[in-house]
């Protein structure tokens, strides 16, 4: 594991895991790193947030070793976002985030005596299951890929939530070097 990966996937880190199995392709499940593992087997031990152990105690969270290549940091979420037709999104469905495409935008207008509000729901098509399902904006996020330590496409700074750990303060402004007499 490289130095950056050690930081992203240290004990207690919130992560997402994909499974390359039939019925799970194109989905990501959130979990917490319980234990990092040596370089030789490139696996880490995860406790999943929404997946349950397949035993008589169905309320116990699933815990298992997963390949490091199937793990990424928790995907970023924008504070507020609307989506357009053909946007590639992740929709929270069946306990995980599933990749799909927005196929319809349904606008809702709500009126009462004091004010008027509007909201939207989105119809999303999932290639993997050939299903089309309607979602509220809060259950969608822009689809992003984790590529060598960077999210693609990148977050728009004004729309993103602040990081979970505080960022270091910016460095003090550099002073110009003193003028030299020639």
Task: Tell where the protein language model's regions lie, with residue ranges.
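Eukaryotic chromatin- and chromosome-associated nuclear factors
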Residues: 1-182
